Amino acid sequence: MSLSKKISVVSKEYVFQFVIITILFALWGIANDLTTPMVSTFKKVMPELTNVQASLVQFAFYFGYFFMALPAALFIRKYSYKSGIIVGLILYATGAFLFYPAAHYQSYNFFLVSLWVITCGLAFLETTSNPLILFLGNKETATQRLNLAQAFNPIGAITGLVMAQFLVIKEIKSDDYSTEAFNALSSTELASIRENDLGIISIPYIGLGLFVLVILVIICLTKMPKTAHEDKMSIGESFKKLLANRNYKHGVIAQAFYVGAQIMCWTFIFQYVDNINKTFGLELTATYYNIGAMLLFLSGRWVGTALMKNTNPSKILMYFGFGGVFCAAGAIVFQGIPGLISLISISIFMSIMFPTIYGIALKDMADEAKIGSAGLVMAIVGGALMPVLQGSILDWGGSGFSDVQILGFIPEVNFSFILPLICLAVVTHYGYATYKLSVKQKKTKNILVTE
């Protein structure tokens, strides 16, 4: 550990490039969390949607990662990291601009396609940016460096939530009526409200698309560093080496479960708060609590990154995993404000999981890292599948959130967080297993040095 203290997290010659690439981490955070509240927003604007249908927003959004991650890895393998970033930004902007015709035609499926195109772009950006960050300094500080870059992702996430709250949720007219009053409106009035609200939903995405174009120009004018090595392995050899790497394979599984947990906790907090409001007669604003969760997430990321200076990353992952499981259990069992506090507290412990799993899984890799990073980005498909499963639990007794009481006292919306709990337990086990392995390897190394 004394060695890591003497090594700078980012090499001096790459500081500017590190800053530019870090902006991309915030940029996909904006898209992620601008979209998260859209599940409940589309449900209000299009009340004919079931909870499962509304959750297809997240399915379409995160399925793009699975679909495009491997092609992105093959693309940057053939060309360059910079080329991958440029393609990613072009797709990002294109998907954002597609919101305009989607709103014009009032097509839910068109919106889903637009979101899918955005995440095809994000798949390029994440597949490119994450491994590139690892190369911008000494490998001893690679995981710490990635955590530092990822610490700016929740800043983007908070920005996305603020945009969603003040540019969309507060402006849509569908939310101004009670269910009874809304159903009593004439077909002409309903059509007018829907046209207005879908137009409002499209505005922040179109603005985001314009901002992405500005970043695209900056990236085109920025000289990016070449990676520390050229691709010497064939694609087949890379796959063979990855499939033989048990640590990597388990890392992909852990990443899929982590992303599923994160998206479920940040998506269904809106339904969780709605149920509290209806049950206890409160008027809580879900977005504010989601922003609070983001702030806790950001704080946890910075604290976790600092802890890694002197503590094994796998050990931190294990302990943070335990904390997440404990809070998820509280979100299930407790009702009202205590349950809500437990739910947002999960974000503290999720904060370091994505970059830490990423860094551990790719540790000591060489040529196969580009393909390996694609597998970890494809694992984000967990964010596409899990919310649909959670939405199906909410539909057990009808369109409400407490139609069914589990064990006689747990509303179905609370019980649905059993899925994030299971996901976080899987991540905890990965942290435990890799920590045990690292301790064993360290002992073996010390014995060899002694001999």
Map each language-model feature to its residues.
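Multi-pass alpha-helical transporter architecture, strongest
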Residues: 2, 6, 11, 20, ...
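Extracytoplasmic gate region of multi-pass secondary transporters
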Residues: 35-39, 160-172, 241-291
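Central cavity-lining transmembrane alpha-helices of secondary-active solute carriers
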Residues: 55-76, 291-303
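Hydrophobic core of transmembrane alpha-helices in multi-pass small-molecule transporters
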Residues: 108-125, 338-353
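Glycine-rich segments within core transmembrane alpha-helices of 12-TM secondary carriers
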Residues: 122, 141-173, 374-387
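Intracellular juxtamembrane helix-capping segments at the cytosolic ends
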Residues: 124-138, 351-366
